[in-house]
């Protein structure tokens, strides 16, 4: 990957996409490699804006932690807007400008193997973030246990349906088919449903995790299975929100239990309103901080501490928590992930009061 053509393309992308970075410490900065003091530039490449978390949580939390650990470090942030080609250009640009570490949450985890290879060819360590890249080992991986997440939300839903003595089957609304993390969640979702009395009525891999595409698909399934839908296992809060919207638009009342994942504000509001059954609390601060710590360790010439290995990549995997109306106050508000002022607005104020959230 050190060919002339690659260098020309990368430099061109750099000029077009980002401009020139200030010389703030390069990979051969001796002070940053002696284990005493880090300096340099970390590229932080996020996948999309379909989920609000990347702009509102991941970016500021990562940047804050890097600043705490390394005053002289700079973060180069880019969002791929759900376009793998755009993210490839952003990565090429960062590599051409000589970033010291690349943190990557891939739009397309298969296509992003090229990004990993290109960076490593320039001796730039790559930290895969949230979504694993299965076909090309990165230098480090930080995430929550995605397969475990899928199993947890599905088992939680099955337990709820059993308690309600529900009949019928389930709609399975998975994440993006080009996201390896989504495939792990999907595997867990299926495992969580297996052995229950609830048949999987239909399954859907949601392109780009797009909530509208999930909503459109669920609307189509309602015409086929309307009276047989006991619930829906949705892979994240975006697809869960799309599922809820489709069920409400079809006049299904009450809305059957629907799962989610990410604990977005809108999902917490739906849980409080009784429109979504569960979500997953996986505080972004945990993975953002872990990724920042790993990046700064690489800048110091150190190896980040791994607790396991996944897809031949040293990894840190954290355990999340299921959130329902029963524990939302404790998990979300008492732990100050969100405040009542952020969530208990307008129509949600009464539900918050009922749950003791103030």
Predicted regions, residues:
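Bacterial Sec-type N-terminal signal peptides, specifically the leucine/valine-rich hydrophobic h-region
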Residues: 18-21
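A residue-level marker of the well-folded mature domains of exported/periplasmic proteins
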Residues: 2-7, 13, 23-358
């Amino acid at each position: 990957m050190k060919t002339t053509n690659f260098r020309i393309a990368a430099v061109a992308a750099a000029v077009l996409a980002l401009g020139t970075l200030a010389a703030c410490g390069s990979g051969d900065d001796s002070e940053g490699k002696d284990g005493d003091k880090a300096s340099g530039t970390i590229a932080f490449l996020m996948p999309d804006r379909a989920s609000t978390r990347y702009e509102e949580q991941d970016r500021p939390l990562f940047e804050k932690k890097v600043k705490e650990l390394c005053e002289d470090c700079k973060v180069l942030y880019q969002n791929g807007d759900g376009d793998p080609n755009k993210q490839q250009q952003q990565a090429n640009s960062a590599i051409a400008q000589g970033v010291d570490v690349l943190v990557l949450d891939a739009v397309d985890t298969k296509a992003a193997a090229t990004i990993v290879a290109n960076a490593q060819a320039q001796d730039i360590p790559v930290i895969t973030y949230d979504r694993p890249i299965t076909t090309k080992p990165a230098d480090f991986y930080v995430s929550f246990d995605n397969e475990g997440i899928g199993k947890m939300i599905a088992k939680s839903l099955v337990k709820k349906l059993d308690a309600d003595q529900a009949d019928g089957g389930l709609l399975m609304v998975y994440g993006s088919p080009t996201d390896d993390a989504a495939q792990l969640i999907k595997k867990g979702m299926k495992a969580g449903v297996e052995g229950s009395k609830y048949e999987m009525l239909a399954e859907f891999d949601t392109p780009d995790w797009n909530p509208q595409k999930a909503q459109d698909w669920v609307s189509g399934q309602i015409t086929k299975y309307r009276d047989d839908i006991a619930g829906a296992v949705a892979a994240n809060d975006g697809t869960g929100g799309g599922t809820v919207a489709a069920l409400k638009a079809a006049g299904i009342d009450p809305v059957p239990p629907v799962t989610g994942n990410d604990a977005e504000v809108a999902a917490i509001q739906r849980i409080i309103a009784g429109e979504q059954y569960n979500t997953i609390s996986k505080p972004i601060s945990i993975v953002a901080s872990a990724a920042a710590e790993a990046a700064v360790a690489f800048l110091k010439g150190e190896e980040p501490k791994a607790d396991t290995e996944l897809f031949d990549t040293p990894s840190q995997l954290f355990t999340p928590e299921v959130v329902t109306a029963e524990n939302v106050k404790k998990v979300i508000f008492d732990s100050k992930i969100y405040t009542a002022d952020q969530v208990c607005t307008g129509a949600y104020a009464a539900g918050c009061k009922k749950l003791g959230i103030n």
